[in-house]
Amino acid sequence: MKIRSVCFLTVLCFIITGVLHAETAELNWLNWSQMPLLPALNGQAEPIGVAGAFVGIHNNALIIAGGANFDKPYDKTQKQWHDDIWVLEKDSDKWLGGFKLDSSIAYGASVSTKYGVVCIGGNDADKCYDNVFLLKWDSKKTIEKTDLPSLPLTCSNTAATTIGDVVYVAGGQQGTRLDSAMKNFWSMDLSKISEPNSLCWKQLPAWSGERRAFNITASQYNGKEYCIYIIGGRYQKSIEDSNWVLLNDIYEFSPTKYAAGKEAWKKCANLPYPIHAVCGMDIGQSHILIFGSAIKTESTNANDSNNTGCFNRGVLAYHTITDTVIKVGQMPLSQVTTTAVKWNNDIVIASGEICPKIRTPQIWKATLLKTSTVFGKANFSVLLVYLIGMIAVGVYFMYRNKNTDDFFRGGQRIPAWAAGLSIFATLLSSITFIAVPAKVYISDWTFITLNLIVIPIIPFIFLCIVPYFRKIDATSAYEYLEKRFNVFIRLFASFSFVLFQIGRMAIVMFLPALALSTMTSMSVPTCILLTGILTVIYCTMGGLEAVVWTDAIQTLVLLGGALYCLFVMINSLNGGFSEFISIANAGAKFHAINWDFSKTSIYTTAFWVMVIGGVGQTLVPFVSDQAIVQRYMVVSDTKKVRNSFITSTIAGTIATVIFFSIGTALYVFYKAHPQNLDPTYQNDAIFPLFISYQLPAGLGGIVIAGIYAAAQSTVSGSVHSISTVVVTDFAKRFSMLKTEKGYLNLARFCTFLFGTLGTILALIFASADIKSLWESFIEVLGLLCGPMCGLFLLGMFTKRVGGISAIIGAVSGVVILFMVGRYTKVNMVLYASAGITACVVVGYLMSFVIPERKKDISGLSIHSM
C-alpha cells in the first residue's frame, strides 16, 4: 500500500506543470555603505579624491597610493599628479598618512597579493613608465616598498589580476595617447620572489580581438579551471582619428590549455553596452561584477555634494559557466578610473572620477545580499508525512525479528527487486544527489563512464564473486577472509570497516545538512538530528528488512523528485525539449568521451582513465563492502541474487541518465534565466538553489524528502552493516554471549550506539572547525578500501597466496596509494584501481618469497570451486 502511494505521488509530480517563482524586474545583489572619506592630498585645501590611484589590500589594511586630480575650480586648473600614500586599517575610521611614493604617478594597475600590493606601470604628465613595485603594510604600521622586475614595455591605463601567485597584466597603452593602445599579455610568478634571478615577466599570446586600454582584467572559475578574462576597454585607431573605439567584448584565457600547447583564448558573450575605464571584481565561484562605464548618461552639478556623477552607474554580472550577462544593481556613485578590491567578504571601490575632471573622496563598500528562503507549511507537511512513514516501516518489521538471522539478513525472505533497489540506494548518497548534477552543470557528461562501467562488471560480480559468499553462507563479508587466510586479517578488515563507516556516516549526514539548511528554515544541527534520529529508530526496530524496504521506498521518492525537477526545468523553456537539446549542444554539455592518450592524460578525465578508475570504484563496494555484500544474502537463492543485480543495474542506469540530465538542464535553465542565479551559493549548491526558489510549495517538499531519502538510505546501510560486523566478527566469533536472544539484543544496541555516534560526530562537524582534520582522517582510512578489495581478489583468484603475503600486499597497497596521492597529480578516480593492483601484485609476488603453511581452501578459490 505504501509503495503504491509513493508511485502515485511520483507520477503526480511528473505530470503537474511547475510554476516558476516570479522573476523581479530589477535585481539588486549589493548592499552599499559608505566608508571614511579619503583625506585632502598634499597641497589641496579639502578632500576632492583622485583618479587612477594604486589601490589594494595588505595585512587587512586598505592602501591608496598616487593618483591624479583637478583642484577646484575644476575648469580653471591643470591636472595634478600625486605621490601620497594613505592607509585605512580594518575597523578604523581614521586614515593614516605621511607616506610617499618615489614619484608622483597615476593610471597604472594594482593587484592585491599575500606579498603586498603589486603596483604596475602608470604615467605622469610627460610619459608612461614600466616600473613595478610592491607596497607592504607592516606590523610597525609603516609602508615598505620593494622594487620588482620592470615590464617588457612602458604601460599605463592597464589592468591586472592573479591566479594563485601568478600576476597577469593585459591591455594598456605604451604612450600618453590612446592610439598607442596594445595587445599585451604578460605574467609573473610571485612564488619566485625570493629568487631575484628567476623572477621575471613572461610574454603570453594575446587574444584575437582588438588592442585596447582602459579594460578590465579579472580571474574567475569557469567550471573547469580558473581563467583570465579581458573585458571591454577602448582604443584610438590613429593620431589623426580622435574618435574612440569603445569595446563590449569578453575574452577568456585558459592557463591549462596554454600549458598543453593548445589554443588558449576563447571569445565569450558580448556585454549589452561598451564599458571602459571602470573596475571589475570576481565574486562567488563563477561571477564577475562590472561596475559602471565611463559613458556619460547623466548631468551633474559639480557644486552639488549629493550628486551621483554623470557616468553609467549600472552594475553588470558576467557568469563564466553559462556565458551570460545581466544587470544586477546600481552603484550609489559613478566612480570610474579606480580599482575594486576585496576586503574580507566585501568589495571596496575607492575614490575615482565621477564626471570629466571631477573626482570624489568617497569610498564605498558593497556587500552581497543573500535571499532568504521560506520553506513553508506545505513543504514541511510533505516532509513530515515522509519521515513518519519511515518510522512506521520500522515499527512494522520490528515484530518479525526473532533472531540475528532475521535482524541481519531479513530471514532471506526479501524479494529480489527490493534487494536490488536497496543495493542501488545504498550506493547512492544524498551527496551524489546534489554533487552529480552540480558536476555536470559546470562541466559535461565525461564522468558518466564511471557510473555506466557497472553494466559490464555486474556479470563478473555475479559469476565470480557472489558464489564465495553464498557458499559459506556469510553474514559478514569478512568471514571469508578468515576461512581463506586467517583470523587476524578478518578482524583487521572488520575493524577498518567499522572506523571508515562511522566517519562516512558523519560526513553523509553533515554535508547534505549544509544543503538542506539552505533550502529550509531549519539549522544544520536540526537537519542532522532529523536524519540521524529517524534512521537509528527504524534501523534499530526493524533490522535489515526495515532497511531494505525503506531503501526501496526511498529510491522511488528520490527518483520521483529528481524527475519532477527535470520536468520543471525543461518546461520553463519557451522551446521545451528541443530548446533544451539545442542550448546543451551549443555549450557542448553532452560531451561524454575525452579521447586523450597523451603522456599527461593520466591527470585528466581521459576515457581510459574513466574506464580503469570506474572498474576499481565498482569492484570496491561489490567485492569488499559489507553494506553491499549483505544484500547478496537477504534473498533465498542465487537466481534471486541475479535478479536483484538486474534491478539494481536498471535503477542505477536510469538514475545516472536522470541526474546527468538534471545537471545539463540546470545549465540550460540558468543560461535561459541567469537572473535566477545567486552568487552567494557555491557551484556545488546549484541544485539546492533551484529547489529552493523554483519549485511550487508542497512539491518542493517531495524533492527535499528525496534528498533525505538518499541520506537515510546510505546512513541506514552503514549503521546496520556496522552492527552486523561487530556482532558477527567479534561477539559471535569469540562466543561472548550464550543465547541467540542475547545476540539479537546486542545487535539492536550496536545499531543504536553506532548510529548515535555517527550523529554526534556529524553535530561536532557542524559546531567546530575540525572539518579539514576529520577529512584527513577519512582520507587515510579511505586508502584501505582499494587494498581491502585486493585482499578478497587475492583470496578468490590465487591459491598460493597465504595470510602473511596477503597482509604485505595490503600494506604495500596502502603505502603506494599514499605516495601516489601525496607526490603525483594522478586523477583521484584511479586511486581505487591503483590500490587494488598494488595489493594483488605485491601479495602474489611475495607468495614466491615467503613459504607458508598450506591450509585447506576448498571452495574458497577459483581453482577449487
Region annotations inferred by a language model:
Residues 1-8:
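Bacterial N-terminal signal peptides that target proteins for export
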Residues 3, 89, 210-211, 233, ...:
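Short, intrinsically disordered low-complexity segments
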Residues 8-18:
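Bacterial N-terminal signal peptides
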Residues 371-865:
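Membrane-embedded helix-loop-helix hairpins and adjacent transmembrane boundary segments
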Residues 2, 14-15, 856, 861:
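Generic short N-terminal amphipathic or hydrophobic helices
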Residues 21-24, 623:
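Intrinsically disordered, low-complexity regulatory regions of eukaryotic regulatory proteins
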